[in-house]
């Protein structure tokens, strides 16, 4: 009798802080099994202060890689498989806009920290640091998040993230 092939089912932890959170516009991506596996694990907070801002004409929440600035950011941890991570890397334009890095997240008083993947904006115009910092993201009518399929191809989000000095 042959052995059944062992499927690698190692799951990673992913911290989400913006439109991917439960009840937010892009959470359906995590909920779709066509993108891979994702399961809510717990609520969490960053272990260091980071600036969370809403920017671009599409009101995208960005977590800037600028430790010590901003607030401790509240979000959610999901257990995800490699297929989901690849789907999210494509969604988040990994390498073009975001980078995915491993950071420790607080999971509660007395509970400690857990290492999680998180999407951070590495390169950004300095004017993003002058925007209002948030400790938690919620889609709103004052800054309505524009889903990717509703954005115009003439103006990709990265066009709003110019790195040159503005006159």
UniProtKB/Swiss-Prot annotation:
The keyword Transferase applies. This is Troponin C-akin-1 protein. It is an enzyme of class 2 (transferase). Its EC number is 2.3.2.-. GO terms for cellular component: cytosol; mitochondrial matrix. PANTHER family: TROPONIN C-AKIN-1 PROTEIN. Keywords: Acyltransferase, Transferase. Putative gamma-glutamylcyclotransferase. It holds the Pfam family GGACT. InterPro entries: AIG2-like_dom (IPR009288), GGACT (IPR039126), GGCT-like (IPR013024), GGCT-like_sf (IPR036568). In embryos, expression is seen in heart cells of the dorsal vessel and hindgut visceral mesoderm. The keyword Transferase applies. It comes from Drosophila melanogaster (Fruit fly). Substrate binds at residues 17-20. One of its GO terms (molecular function) is gamma-glutamylaminecyclotransferase activity. Belongs to the gamma-glutamylcyclotransferase family.
